[in-house]
Amino acid sequence: MAWWRQGYIKKIFDEVGNKIGGISFAILGIAAYDFKKLGFNETYMHTTPSQALEMGKSLKANKVIGSHFLTFVLSLEKVLDPPKLFKENAEKYGYKKDDAVIFKIGEVKNLKELTN
């Protein structure tokens, strides 16, 4: 698959992380990734929860915020899996569970809450 049709290109995210030297938080998509039964072997322009956590590490983000889930059913993963997997896998990628943030529907937080 062409590089531009993938959600995560490690080389690019590593380069950005190295160039800027880290960020407070990254907002990254965590859903609409399971297209295997449709004939695609890769995530096709979206990222898995694990890829989002890896992207956060590449960007040297202190916290990662999972986004782009529970909106539309665009692929074949179970609708509630992405936020669950995102939190469950946080520690594998060097994040504390509290540093992998999932907002509830309608939840609002200010930047001070996110950066503490």
Regions found by a protein language model. Name each.
Residues 8-103:
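Cap/insert and terminal regions of metallo-dependent hydrolase folds
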Residues 1-6:
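Conserved beta-strand hairpin/beta-sheet module of binuclear metal-dependent hydrolase folds
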